[in-house]
Amino acid sequence: MNKIDHRINYILMLDTETANTLSGENGTLDMSNVLVYDLGFAVIDKRGTVYESASYVNRDIFVYERELMQSAYYSNKIPQYVEDIRNGNRKMASYSEIRKAIFEVVEKYNIKVVCAHNSRFDVNAVNITQRYLTKSKYRYFLPYGLEVWDTMKMAQSVIFKQKTYREFCEKNGYLTKNNQCRKTAEVLYRYISGNNEFIESHTGLEDVMIEKEILAYCFRQHKAMEKVLYPAPLPKPIEEEDIYCFEDYLKYL
């Protein structure tokens, strides 16, 4: 095992795929009760170098909530997951085992930051799943004290200000109905990689690998940028020693 360089500010890049994705009355997706069945993460630095990675399938949802799995937005990928588990490309584990693995890697690398693309969704998803599976006995999934970054905020600060990105979106039809450039990881990666044929996998670890490239690209521009979704919280509440407690500090923002 390579020796850990404690001069590096390691980052935990995270991505989730979820079930229980319900359609609202107007056809929009209701993401308020999503449940994580796929969680991938990688330990990276600001250059996008990967030091460790893992791909987990949450047994508690994937196996024990088979009916809910049919509501997954990418339920057509279920056979692929089964094959990946069989050939060792993904590890089946309980949600508590996945959480333990994250706690261990955060401690191992002294990680202070967790990052995702549209991280509000992923942070909410892991917490909703934690509450669902423990009947709210345990409410927060991530280790307490992490700062939460969002590559979507980074891209809006850096990539969206590039004239060439606007031209790229106009040329390829990557504009919203409000004539704004799209900010999906897939479109952003197509732009920074020069591969306009790229198709996002929509599986946890594979998506982490493109999102860390968005992060690295933004840092390479050496521009001022917004990146923090949730800053590191206030000192840990004595009565809640092992949770990521947003409510205790969001009111101070």
Model-inferred region functions:
Residues 2-3, 170-180, 191-192, 198, ...:
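Acidic two-metal-ion nuclease catalytic site recognized across multiple nuclease folds
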Residues 16-19, 151, 211:
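Ser/Thr-centric signal marking residues that sit
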Residues 56-59, 141-159:
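A short, structured active-site edge motif that brings together acidic residues
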Residues 110-116, 137-138, 196-202:
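Short helix-to-loop capping/linker segments positioned immediately adjacent to catalytic or ligand/cofactor-binding
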